């Protein structure tokens, strides 16, 4: 599954993030494919697995996203927040910005019919919206 498709960190933090990914592989006994746009710190990660263990995938995503944020990075550098990362938006941008996002959404879309579940959500989304290629 393609679970962590779009994180980016400052170049000086990339070796730390790669170490974190290697530790995640060991901890969860998984293998990953890591690629991206190293020149701008953008990292794509895929699990090498045909199984869909949602608890495992969610744990990996939470741990990795927390590390990216801790290392002054973003979990949505190239492709936007989308459905898979919506549950992490509040942590990424902070409570104040998240509340601002909610207010804007309520003003522009009071019936929540435009892009439901994107960015503003209370549901867990990371495993529900996995890419399978």
Which residue ranges define each predicted feature?
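Gly-rich Lys/Arg/Thr-decorated short loops/hinges at beta-loop-alpha junctions or inter-strand turns
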Residues: 1-4
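Phosphate/diphosphate-binding loops
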Residues: 7, 13-25, 30, 49-77, ...
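Short glycine-rich loop/turn motifs
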Residues: 31-32, 42
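Short Gly/Ser/Thr- and Asp/Glu-enriched loop/turn motifs at secondary-structure junctions
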Residues: 37-42, 78-82
């Amino acid at each position: 599954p393609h679970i962590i498709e779009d994180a980016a960190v400052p170049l000086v933090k990339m070796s730390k993030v790669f170490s974190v990914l290697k530790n995640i592989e060991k901890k969860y006994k998984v293998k990953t494919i890591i690629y991206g746009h190293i020149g701008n710190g953008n990292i794509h990660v895929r699990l090498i697995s045909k199984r869909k263990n949602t608890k495992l995938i969610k744990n990996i995503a939470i741990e990795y996203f927390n590390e990216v944020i801790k290392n002054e990075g973003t979990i949505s550098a190239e492709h936007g927040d989308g459905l898979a990362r919506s549950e992490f938006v509040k942590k990424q941008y902070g409570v104040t910005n998240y509340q601002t996002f909610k207010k804007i959404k309520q003003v522009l879309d009071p019936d929540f019919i435009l892009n439901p579940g994107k960015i503003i959500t209370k549901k867990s989304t990371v495993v529900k919206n996995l890419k399978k290629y």
